[in-house]
Amino acid sequence: MIKDKEMGKKLLESIETLNEAAYELYSMVLNDNEGLDDFVKTMQALLIGIKGNVTGLVVEEPALKCNLLVDNALDTLEKLDGISEKKRKLGIIKNELIPEIGEAYVDLLFWGGCFPDPDAMFEYYNNQMKEFYPAPEKDKGRYRYDLSVAVMANTDVEQVKKCLKFLNDAVPEGLRCEYVLFNDGVGKKVAKYFDDLVDKNVKVINYKHQTNAPSVIYQLVEGKDVLFLTTENILSKTAVSNMMKCLTSDKKIGAVCPAFVEEDKLDDTEINEYLWHQKSELNTDVVLAPSNEILMPTMLGAYFPFMAKRYTEFSSKAMSLIGRRNGKLLYEAGDALACRVHKEEDEDIVLEGIKQFERIMGINPMLEQDVDQDLLSGLDFKNKEKRVDILGINSSFGINLLAIQDRVREESKNLRTNIYSLNEEEAYERDLEAIAKKGRFISDWDKDFDKCFPNARFDYIVMEKTNGKLLDLMLLLKLLERLKDGGVMAIHTAEEMPLSDYEPRKVIGDWQILYK
């Protein structure tokens, strides 16, 4: 946050004037008005003045990218001078210059005026965020495109070409589709390659300087759904169609990602709904989501910005958490395959991300996101022909419950599964609500347990975090009574517990597994 609020206010007013000038420039080009060169010079002078003031503020608040965005806008204006084709000029002003100026305004407003003050940030989230990034509009009840394919170039030009080749093969024929190609400062070769691709349904944003901020993409998409990917990824031929089928299979699904494999396993897989796995968190290097809902703009950083580095692995964690807490289901389509270039993890980014995420979202995103293989190895998932009911007790994000559900669906070809949740930890209550058919928060097991799902019987009961009350003999006996014939109860504890002589019973790692 910058200290000189008056300076910030004046700069915002200057950028607002610049934004109006950009729209006027578009009108002048459209109508073949005279005085275009002088008008552009005036805009350049205004940008240079803004840049001089903003550069000093970046020293004060390093999270700002406004100086880079202003420099990108200057580069765009210079580029216009060398273009004679009217249609191309209009495209650059509309798809590059105006969005760059809009991004500069929001950047200074939020990172200069709100971050890192939580109260100011939440004020922005609640009252301004959606105003600056409105969802695409319909025309006569219909979106302009069925699908917006948004590609963020963050690799060399050869990998960019490879990514787009696989992508073009994967986009289903017959879709009303647009492409939004975002070159985030990765060089002139990529910029030229993108410029050569400009067409009626291809929008290009060429940044001179890297910002690592794909929020600009959300200013341009006009499709019903948005497929986002970075050029580090390549897709199988059936990936997009299978992801789209998964997304539209249930109105509650908010986002879908592919399954990531090695390139030599990038097969064209037929549609297979048994491979659609509900997740607590998605990998958003490739992700498909409706354009008018909260998940895609959150992942892009247009909604709920919280971390100075912008697009990182925490973008997917933020999108997933916001999605869960808005009642949206997250799916990995196992019949949609993708391959990504290996990336080294930046420990500094991880540490900053954990700190900022926990401060704003109220939860550590790195905790308990791995499936417990010891647990799964002690359970049987075959021949489950009837409806399968799973009860989780203190299941955090529900990772293991979803893994059990996935294995039942795959191995028994059975989609009739229900997850129930009993939970003592308030921090996870809203996350569990998103995955459970029924869930209850419990503060007193003696008083409340008998009232919880009294008629339900379970194939699996999984107690992930224990305490003295949960390991009480009477409660354990009541839980065993809630198992169906052939059911199993898994308790995560290395301590001595009642029923130690119960048979049949198996101990795997820290899990004690009781079979009925």
Can you say where each PLM-predicted feature lies in the sequence?
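A conserved hydrophobic helix/loop-capping motif in glycosyltransferases and polysaccharide synthases
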Residues: 147-159, 163, 170, 182, ...
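Active-site nucleotide-sugar/metal-binding loop of Leloir-type enzymes
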Residues: 215-225
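A short, conserved alpha-helix in the catalytic core of glycosyltransferases
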Residues: 291-336
